[in-house]
Amino acid sequence: MSIRFQKAAALSNFSRYNPNSGRGFYESYFIRANHPKDPKAFWIRYTLFSPKSKPKDSIGELWVIYFDGAEVFSSKTEIPWSQCQFPRKQFSVQIGDSYINNVVAKGQSNHLQ
């Protein structure tokens, strides 16, 4: 893989959110995995939501979904913007204690239903 391609791929993951724009904004990053043999899967989504003309009301949302082969369990947690990071110069998203970057992802919920 060329260095040019690697740089373009990295840049494509940087957040595009500009809190000074006043425009509404929605951006998501996610990771999912399926068990290779059993009908099991999980999905974790890290989302930034900023309502139009109200950047002070921006929040981070952590969505967690788990399928055990018979049932689907899900949760959505809203986190205050003060506990979130969506940098524009690197791929390192954080929502509360959950995060995703080029190397690792962590997301958990104690509210699966």
What are the functions of these language-model segments?
Residues 1-113:
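Targeting-peptide/extracellular-domain and disordered-appendage signature
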